[in-house]
Amino acid sequence: MAPNIRKSHPLLKIINNSLIDLPSPSNISAWWNFGSLLGICLITQILTGLLLAMHYTADTTLAFSSVAHTCRNVQYGWFIRNLHANGASFFFICIYLHIGRGLYYGSYLYKETWNTGVILLLTLMATAFVGYVLPWGQMSFWGATVITNLFSAIPYIGQTLVEWAWGGFSVDNPTLTRFFALHFLLPFVIAGITLVHLTFLHESGSNNPLGIISHCDKIPFHPYFSLKDILGFTLMFIPLLSLAFFSPNLLGDPENFTPANPLATPPHIKPEWYFLFAYAILRSIPNKLGGVLALAASVLILFLIPLLHKSKQRSMTFRPLSQLLFWFLVANLLILTWIGSQPVEHPFIIIGQVASFTYFLILLVLFPAIAALENKMIY
């Protein structure tokens, strides 16, 4: 009998073992769909981004009008741009849900997979930030100015670092040029780290909702989960296309319809919605360096999660107290997101400070404490 090329060819064999004959737990729920959704988001963003880059000019005098030209004169340019801008939002929705799933079901105990995932999140955040600057609208310019300026809080080397990043003494043409170069490069870096992420995942196999070893009950990825993933793609593309067609500017900032003007500051400088929780944490500390450290800690804290796992069970499925705390954390993040979009005035300042404190308290203190308490109650 002739050997099956799918199983013998050096390249196809890798694809087969990753996407076709991969043994998967039989009970993984829809929460396990977000990995593949992130993959399809990345592919969509790279394709639409490539098409946009063909019509974009990375120059301060031309950037804004080149984006306008793409939307007005390029065939389906408006659609490609809307898909790219809103695709970024869906990318972040998927990654936040994916991380939430990992937290809830204890997937972070696959430490290498988790750590590469956090690196992917950081790279994605960097990519989205530099991408937001490219249309060179008011919020693009001032967002870039405010966020890059944070590096000046680093003692001794801060100011030099900022001027080095800017390529001058303010955000200007060199900044835009290098941000475009970085925005072009980073998605391919993300694709590379994704392969590492998957390699580590396939070393151990997927976790499952019960958080128990599932070697005795595995099913092939294809057709079961390949079909389930296609359903997931459909369910994601429906709202994405609806947003891109019917309300493309819903999540954007109206300030970005005005070309960048270094002489006029917008009344409220705020990032895109997916960074608002971190922005709220940054603003809640009335000290520049303290705020920057809190901002960094708000994301880097994810690296500590595996070390703070004190429960004798992996998943939260059978831990009602931890579940309650988890949903408190979700509510807390929603409050932070709302606060980040509000002006810096009473009562938003104090709400933001309480929510920021609670965020770190839940992750660093309450999760391990409640886990230890549950161990006492159960065992």
Swiss-Prot record:
<keyword id="KW-0479">Metal-binding</keyword>
<keyword id="KW-0408">Iron</keyword>
<keyword id="KW-0472">Membrane</keyword>
<keyword id="KW-0830">Ubiquinone</keyword>
<protein>
    <recommendedName>
        <fullName>Cytochrome b</fullName>
    </recommendedName>
</protein>
<dbReference type="InterPro" id="IPR005798">
    <property type="entry name" value="Cyt_b/b6_C"/>
</dbReference>
<dbReference type="InterPro" id="IPR016174">
    <property type="entry name" value="Di-haem_cyt_TM"/>
</dbReference>
<feature type="binding site" description="axial binding residue">
    <location>
        <position position="98"/>
    </location>
    <ligand>
        <name>heme b b566</name>
    </ligand>
</feature>
<keyword id="KW-0813">Transport</keyword>
<feature type="transmembrane region" description="Helical">
    <location>
        <begin position="348"/>
        <end position="368"/>
    </location>
</feature>
<keyword id="KW-0496">Mitochondrion</keyword>
<dbReference type="InterPro" id="IPR048259">
    <property type="entry name" value="Cytochrome_b_N_euk/bac"/>
</dbReference>
<feature type="transmembrane region" description="Helical">
    <location>
        <begin position="179"/>
        <end position="199"/>
    </location>
</feature>
<dbReference type="Pfam" id="PF00032">
    <property type="entry name" value="Cytochrom_B_C"/>
</dbReference>
<feature type="binding site" description="axial binding residue">
    <location>
        <position position="183"/>
    </location>
    <ligand>
        <name>heme b b562</name>
    </ligand>
</feature>
<dbReference type="InterPro" id="IPR005797">
    <property type="entry name" value="Cyt_b/b6_N"/>
</dbReference>
<dbReference type="GO" id="GO:0008121">
    <property type="term" value="F:ubiquinol-cytochrome-c reductase activity"/>
</dbReference>
<keyword id="KW-0999">Mitochondrion inner membrane</keyword>
<dbReference type="InterPro" id="IPR030689">
    <property type="entry name" value="Cytochrome_b"/>
</dbReference>
<comment type="function">
    <text>Component of the ubiquinol-cytochrome c reductase complex (complex III or cytochrome b-c1 complex) that is part of the mitochondrial respiratory chain. The b-c1 complex mediates electron transfer from ubiquinol to cytochrome c. Contributes to the generation of a proton gradient across the mitochondrial membrane that is then used for ATP synthesis.</text>
</comment>
<keyword id="KW-0812">Transmembrane</keyword>
<dbReference type="InterPro" id="IPR048260">
    <property type="entry name" value="Cytochrome_b_C_euk/bac"/>
</dbReference>
<feature type="binding site" description="axial binding residue">
    <location>
        <position position="197"/>
    </location>
    <ligand>
        <name>heme b b566</name>
    </ligand>
</feature>
<keyword id="KW-0349">Heme</keyword>
<feature type="transmembrane region" description="Helical">
    <location>
        <begin position="227"/>
        <end position="247"/>
    </location>
</feature>
<feature type="binding site">
    <location>
        <position position="202"/>
    </location>
    <ligand>
        <name>a ubiquinone</name>
    </ligand>
</feature>
<feature type="transmembrane region" description="Helical">
    <location>
        <begin position="321"/>
        <end position="341"/>
    </location>
</feature>
<keyword id="KW-1133">Transmembrane helix</keyword>
<dbReference type="GO" id="GO:0045275">
    <property type="term" value="C:respiratory chain complex III"/>
</dbReference>
<dbReference type="GO" id="GO:0005743">
    <property type="term" value="C:mitochondrial inner membrane"/>
</dbReference>
<feature type="binding site" description="axial binding residue">
    <location>
        <position position="84"/>
    </location>
    <ligand>
        <name>heme b b562</name>
    </ligand>
</feature>
<feature type="transmembrane region" description="Helical">
    <location>
        <begin position="114"/>
        <end position="134"/>
    </location>
</feature>
<feature type="transmembrane region" description="Helical">
    <location>
        <begin position="78"/>
        <end position="99"/>
    </location>
</feature>
<comment type="subunit">
    <text>The cytochrome bc1 complex contains 11 subunits: 3 respiratory subunits (MT-CYB, CYC1 and UQCRFS1), 2 core proteins (UQCRC1 and UQCRC2) and 6 low-molecular weight proteins (UQCRH/QCR6, UQCRB/QCR7, UQCRQ/QCR8, UQCR10/QCR9, UQCR11/QCR10 and a cleavage product of UQCRFS1). This cytochrome bc1 complex then forms a dimer.</text>
</comment>
<feature type="transmembrane region" description="Helical">
    <location>
        <begin position="289"/>
        <end position="309"/>
    </location>
</feature>
<dbReference type="InterPro" id="IPR036150">
    <property type="entry name" value="Cyt_b/b6_C_sf"/>
</dbReference>
<feature type="transmembrane region" description="Helical">
    <location>
        <begin position="34"/>
        <end position="54"/>
    </location>
</feature>
<keyword id="KW-0249">Electron transport</keyword>
<keyword id="KW-0679">Respiratory chain</keyword>
<comment type="similarity">
    <text>Belongs to the cytochrome b family.</text>
</comment>
<dbReference type="Pfam" id="PF00033">
    <property type="entry name" value="Cytochrome_B"/>
</dbReference>
<dbReference type="GO" id="GO:0006122">
    <property type="term" value="P:mitochondrial electron transport, ubiquinol to cytochrome c"/>
</dbReference>
